[in-house]
Amino acid sequence: MVRALHEAGFEVIMDVVYNHTCESGPEGPTICWRGLDNLSYYRRTKDKISRLYDTTGCGNTLDFTNTHVTTFAVDSLRYWAKRIGIDGFRFDLAATLARLDGEFTRYHPFLYALRSDILLGNLKMIMEPWDCGPNGWRTGEFGIPFAEWNDRFRDCTRKFWLTDVDRTRSGEYGEMTMQDMATRLCGSSDLFATDPDRGSTASVNYVACHDGFTTADLTMYKSKHNEANGENNHDGTNDNHSVNFGHEGPSSDQIIVQQRQRATMNLLGTLLLSLGTPMLLAGDEFGNSQNGNNNAYTQDNDITWLDWDWLYSTEQTPELKQFNLTSRLITLRKSHDLYSHEDFFTRLSKIGLLKKSDRVHWYLPNGQMPDDSDWTNPAVRSFAMQLLSPDE
């Protein structure tokens, strides 16, 4: 499969989960490292060695302060890269892999092993920069050569186009300012300008992923609907920043349908025209829905299956329309050298200083450039960004 994808021009990034095993908590089955060396492979609380220390939400956490655990993970990665030809890896709950004495550090031996390995250090390595433990959100802190999922981009984009619009319609100010949105559009330097040579491509921008709502569901459901998961709708996050445009779920009202379609393309347009590395959830290109389920990992049925029947329709279906628009956005992005570099086009540096870039211009609807007060004024909802190539 990997060889076939390579022949078709695709790189293959593999999602790997080294933070826990499938044995769950103390009462779980013995089917992995627990049966070999329970005390060495799993993290324990300091006050009671028999108690597992869990930063994954899965009942157990592998102990990456143990040299054998680090060696096991590195050997596994090298096998997939060298023998199978994997081009890179996405590390699930990566903050767990970099905890020493319970605290995250970018200088963790495991991260050092990845950086210094002659094979792995030249591959694409993407971190999910958080876990369920204390101080677990570490977005932007992994450093070179790692890319990281940018949850700030996700939340800012959702709020700006969805919940902030709802608030302004009821006479309130939104949460996101022009400065907030501009920073995300320009590569999130406040998070990723952490090293002299670290660029905007370290920011993996996304609006939706396998966890949470699909992009279409962000515009159809104000609340999660996880009843099919069998946990009385208690599972899954309630922090979705989603709207329903006046009706929960699918609607035949064409005004609502058009509002949702426009909002969806606003989200995808922002994703695909921002500096950084865009990540698109499979199915978002044609408006796939999970019926409001935002924790669908347990569902192997039509809730999560992608329906491609629209491809064979002779009509201009909503799916085909969105697919074509998304394809045009991708083509537009690939046709400009603006997105093939790592510069940050921003006013805000990591240390909070304002710096100008001669490759980005900002305009208000009246054609004037914004002044300093406009950047933090929540009433400023409309602005234009002009990016210039190096030759202009």
Which residues does each predicted region cover?
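Conserved alpha/beta catalytic core and glycan-binding cleft of carbohydrate-active enzymes
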Residues: 85, 100, 106-282, 286-287, ...
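Conserved, mostly hydrophobic/aromatic
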Residues: 5, 15, 80, 91, ...
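Aromatic- and glycine-enriched glycan-recognition loops and surfaces
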Residues: 1-11, 71, 104-112, 254-268, ...
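Substrate-binding/active-site clefts of carbohydrate-active enzymes
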Residues: 1-85, 93-119, 124, 136, ...
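Aromatic- and carboxylate-lined catalytic core of secreted/periplasmic carbohydrate-active enzymes
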Residues: 312-345
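Non-catalytic scaffold segments within catalytic domains of secreted glycoside hydrolases
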Residues: 53-60, 104, 241-255, 302-303, ...
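Acidic, His- and aromatic-enriched active-site or binding-groove loops in soluble protein domains
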Residues: 32-46, 146-160, 301-308
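Carbohydrate-binding surface patches
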Residues: 362-392
